Amino acid sequence: MDNLFTFLHEIEDRYARTIFNFHLISCDEIGDIYGLMKERISSEDMFDNIVYNKDIHPAIKKLVYCDIQLTKHIINQNTYPVFNDSSQVKCCHYFDINSDNSNISSRTVEIFEREKSSLVSYIKTTNKKRKVNYGEIKKTVHGGTNANYFSGKKSDEYLSTTVRSNINQPWIKTISKRMRVDIINHSIVTRGKSSILQTIEIIFTNRTCVKIFKDSTMHIILSKDKDEKGCIHMIDKLFYVYYNLFLLFEDIIQNEYFKEVANVVNHVLTATALDEKLFLIKKMAEHDVYGVSNFKIGMFNLTFIKSLDHTVFPSLLDEDSKIKFFKGKKLNIVALRSLEDCINYVTKSENMIEMMKERSTILNSIDIETESVDRLKELLLK
């Protein structure tokens, strides 16, 4: 980890990170984080009864548990704004909301109606304006006019699916779905699977998302703010997430190990100089501290922050290159999966930029109208 941050610091005058995803590999010392969190979230409907430590409340926006039988969101109401009457309701036509109408539940309903949650994304994705049923086309070909075509409603206790078809082309379907959600206090509950993954998610107020899988491996999607400047800010954001995450685990799992790790993490946060932060991170790796010793890069992107004032020559890019140009002159390096990958493509990017500058200078010095076609091809296509 310290070597990655050291290199990112070396190039931060030219490149900035955008997407940054990584994993914390499960290890024996931490126990069954997934199972214990599942048990706590499943049995409670108040945020305070899950997250006891009030010091970390401002950092955590929501907890989500999703498996084949149940999806449950527990929200931290204090992290949401007070809505006015003109605040846009996003999801009324997708859901039937059942609530006990208490003040706490009514506030949760208000938040759910206005937040673009994963439940909204799921139900919008499964609603299909047009879908071709190829099995029914086959019936038409082989069965003639006596073929049976389905349209109508299919439903269970929590999901209603309406299938409509055109009388002239009955194999083309329009599918709409409505989902029932039960809102009690801070909890938003629906039955059945509402995601392709069985995970527990911790959504932070800074938009970072931590996904915990059944083996307690974690996938962390680190958010980025517009005011993030350089590697030191990135380290602070990552270790701020660590600090609050590990205190949450200590809260739920009652494992003193996480409190000890949170204290070590806090030393990185309170250090003011980058060199000191990197030194502490290196020491954590040497002592096999959770969060550093089991850190594994998932994928990250870099963007070239300087302006490209010369002509861009796309022909210099390999077909499978991770260097991409967006909107003509925006250079990004995408899907980097290791420090070695990063060093390799940054080096390629630097060399390519220099080659483009040279070609651009030559191109600007010649008369395009009189120059030979072969010479122009050599500049533009090779």
Swiss-Prot record:
The keyword Transcription regulation is assigned to this record: yes
Cysteine disulfide partners in this protein: none
Induction behaviour: Expressed in the early phase of the viral replicative cycle.
InterPro entries: Poxvirus_intermed-TF (IPR008789)
Pfam families: Pox_int_trans (PF05718)
Organism: Vaccinia virus (strain Western Reserve) (VACV)
Gene Ontology BP annotations: DNA-templated viral transcription
Entry keywords, A to Z: Activator, Early protein, Phosphoprotein, Transcription, Transcription regulation
Sequence similarity: Belongs to the orthopoxvirus OPG150 family.
Self-association state and partner proteins as the record states: Heterodimerizes with protein A8 to form the virus intermediate transcription factor (VITF)-3.
Keyword Nucleus: no
Physiological role: Acts with RNA polymerase to initiate transcription from intermediate gene promoters.
Protein name per UniProt: Intermediate transcription factor 3 large subunit
